[in-house]
Swiss-Prot record:
Monomer. The gene is glcB. It comes from Mycobacterium avium (strain 104). This is Malate synthase G. Acetyl-CoA binds at V118, R125, F126, S276, R313, P548. The active site is at R341, D638. It catalyses: glyoxylate + acetyl-CoA + H2O = (S)-malate + CoA + H(+). Belongs to the malate synthase family. GlcB subfamily.
Amino acid sequence: MTDRVSAGNLRVARVLYDFVNDEALPGTDIDPDSFWAGVDKVVTDLTPRNQELLRRRDELQAQIDKWHRQRVIEPLDIDAYRDFLIEIGYLLPEPEDFTITTSGVDDEITTTAGPQLVVPVLNARFALNAANARWGSLYDALYGTDVIPETDGAEKGSSYNKVRGDKVIAYARNFLDQAVPLESGSWADATGLSVEDGRLQVATADGSVGLAEPEKFAGYTGQLGSPDWSVLLVNHGLHIEILIDPQSPVGKTDRAGIKDVVLESAVTTIMDFEDSVAAVDADDKVLGYRNWLGLNKGDLSEEVSKDGKTFTRVLNADRTYTTPDGQGELTLPGRSLLFVRNVGHLMTNDAIVLSDGDEEKEVFEGIMDALFTGLTAIHGLKTGEANGPLQNSRTGSIYIVKPKMHGPDEVAFTCELFSRVEDVLGLPQGTLKIGIMDEERRTTVNLKACIKAAADRVVFINTGFLDRTGDEIHTSMEAGPMIRKGAMKNTTWIKAYEDANVDIGLAAGFKGKAQIGKGMWAMTELMADMVEQKIGQPKAGATTAWVPSPTAATLHAMHYHYVDVGAVQEELAGKKRTTIEQLLTIPLAKELAWAPEEIREEVDNNCQSILGYVVRWVAQGVGCSKVPDIHDVALMEDRATLRISSQLLANWLRHGVITEEDVRASLERMAPLVDAQNAKDAAYQPMAPNFDDSLAFLAAQDLILTGTQQPNGYTEPILHRRRREVKARAAQSN
């Protein structure tokens, strides 16, 4: 039984109540009684509106389901379909042109194009690593990944391999030639660096040369000409630091004494309370809120053991350089600018219950997140004894990503919630900024109206292919069987979706004011492929794109040196490359021409993916992890990948492509494979052979067999219920 404290109409879990009063409120000048009275009022006032928005989702889905069922044997008449969506209020009139007016936004969002990390906030070590990933070693990123092939004697090995190291150095020199070229010759020919009359000079066998664009020299550290110093360069607003130490192990092997090239990498990071975490009760939520508080105060730390040594990981300090003329000082952020992703409007959490007559109802988690992540983020706006040594925003803003909103009314509700939270916290109106995830179909087709609803708060829009595909399938569940998962990336609607997001953002004045973002690279070990392919996102006009690790952030940062995103956006400005009809094109299989082995392959692939993710979520509370696929390729999985896999199989089941027996047989085939892939985890509990005793196995089965009944195809209700069962069992056994 949860120990609770009464606060007006609310009964708050003591663990949350004590955290707020003892840890979060001190240093904010907010009176505890006033705060809890404010929380009570916000929850009481906004809960009915939240419920109404969810009822509207269900109402629209029921109307769409009925429309498709009445026409299931007919080819889709796109004009009739569009008119129907207008008639029921799903597709809304497009607003007149407007420009966003958001103010007080940090440069990392308005002007600097670069990678964006997303990391589960419940894991302090991951969170610290991500916050510190503002700067990363290019040498380490190249040496430790498949960007440098392990051929011709260039294997990684257990100790430093000079052959591989030389290839790393050559690759980095080629990068410098493209990002900060010399006025003649190549960085590969460099034999030394110096600063003369405030200008960088690079010595070569043919004499000394400067940069082709001298203004790209931004500063230096250390004593000029000393054995250990560095040179700071800048290109497209991103910094490059060349570390020079001829006496270091790597510097000894380099003609110019260069020991590393460090890139400004994860310019922004999203600390995630949503799809990458498993937070089902007050204890889980407080763990996340406490880590978010520590990040904002700057005092979060974690004991880390590595290579037999233990050390304390803390947040990095800012970086200071001498200006090129030797007279001034330049300070650059040492940490990523932090967003926090709250949960969406759907789920409730028993961390707080609301008394409603004789009933007690769990409070909407999205309302709680806005209140408590907003409160704890106040400490990131100032420094002092009670607020910690570091700041997050330098412009007085708190950046909240809001996911899974369906249409402009839900965006407007979030803005109303943020305004009410600002009143409770005594913050100026407009302090809480919103990042809009364009990952639900009703938001995509009404994106301009969604942005207008948040025109004075919006700081980013972002496409999310996986969740968006999950909603695409669920919205049109009754229309017929969908194409295979791997074919989704080549559909008409996907290209239209990605292009429209950029076009609409630019038309609303995002250039120089807000981020336009694109999705995650999930194949964590395939960095060579990422370096080859992910450049397409800045080329498409995106000022940021998601990466799964600090190493990936450093490698992806190169793309923003190769591509001038600002110039791309100028080229795209004023263009409208898509139609609403393209966005509404449903990815139906034109004919069911799959061979039995193709169907089995698709079912097995999806069942393995579902089991591999769900077993860690339900049994261990791990919301984001590298999950090997059926071919043992490590993929970064979260609830978005689960949603698309489960919804596709639910769709095939609904239309008779597969049977319940096929699903069960595949799950039973794949469970031993997943068990084997987790064999090295001492805490892992196998699903086979007692499948029906495994709550994780049953959760995976539920997600598929009841997938058509899940609200908008979301996986959270089943995951939360099964995870709570696991925790209850553990509590009983203790």
